Amino acid sequence: MTETPEIQPVRIRDYVCGPGEPLLVIAGPCVLQSRELALQIGEELARINQRSDVQVIFKASFDKANRTSLAAQRGPGIEQGLGLLEAVRANTGLPVTTDIHLPEQAAAVGEVCDLLQIPAFLARQTDLLVAAASTGRPVNVKKGQFMSPGDMRYVVDKLRGSGDGGVMACERGTFFGYGRLVNDMQAIPIMRSLGVPVVFDATHSVQQPGGLGGATGGNREMVEPLARAAVAIGCDALFFETHPDPQTSPSDGPNMIPLDRFAGTLDRLLRLREAVDGLDG
């Protein structure tokens, strides 16, 4: 029988993600819109980060390169977007992360961001993975909606073979026919058995691809139930998108948590994690 490797904790600035560490929470708006909005959300996340049982990273995209429609808004672009992320980092003290879509974006993003993210649709793109890992930054790679959790071993191998910044794998749902995603919670322990901390993306898991015609729909009321299941089964980190007024977000509004509900949602999840940790004590 092949021995299961120990999970290798991932260091993100002063944070550590892995077994026995405070819950890592990656959160923010889906896409960067303005400096004012980014700082508003970042300041609320920094307030939450004062808790001792959580480690918060600010996340937002500078380009939504896989939008459903050509007419959909994509974001401010890499130059302006990285400037906004730098402002959030400087004003809140939070680590920041964003996703990259092309290998040539990796170096510039690695200069600003503390963690690089690989979108699920691009999880098997070798050149992108190699470029991300080569920055020396830790990488959070989302499991493709079309992939089995066991097949993520090859993705992890590509990243580990190209850099030593650390790897996290993220569960964000699996295609279930057309326009629907489901979560197989077995994915969390299976991917942890690859020796990496596992993130659960609670808001993208409730997406309904193409559910609004030229845009993606979603069901935010299912975000917390799924996040509770992920915490109960032992995820190392949670991922959420949040916005003061989700209906005005250019992307993913239907599955985002309203900012004024985020702290309460997280508090309940942290109390659940404390109870789960007690079972292992």
Curated annotation (Swiss-Prot):
It holds the Pfam family DAHP_synth_1. InterPro entries: Aldolase_TIM, DAHP1/KDSA, KDO8P_synthase. Keywords: Cytoplasm, Lipopolysaccharide biosynthesis, Transferase. GO terms for molecular function: 3-deoxy-8-phosphooctulonate synthase activity. Its EC number is 2.5.1.55. One of its GO terms (biological process) is keto-3-deoxy-D-manno-octulosonic acid biosynthetic process. It is an enzyme of class 2 (transferase). Its main location: cytoplasm. It is found in: Cytoplasm. The keyword Cytoplasm applies. GO terms for cellular component: cytosol. It catalyses: D-arabinose 5-phosphate + phosphoenolpyruvate + H2O = 3-deoxy-alpha-D-manno-2-octulosonate-8-phosphate + phosphate. Pathway: Carbohydrate biosynthesis; 3-deoxy-D-manno-octulosonate biosynthesis; 3-deoxy-D-manno-octulosonate from D-ribulose 5-phosphate: step 2/3; Bacterial outer membrane biogenesis; lipopolysaccharide biosynthesis. Belongs to the KdsA family. This is 2-dehydro-3-deoxyphosphooctonate aldolase. The lineage of its organism: Bacteria, Pseudomonadati, Planctomycetota, Planctomycetia, Pirellulales. The gene is kdsA.
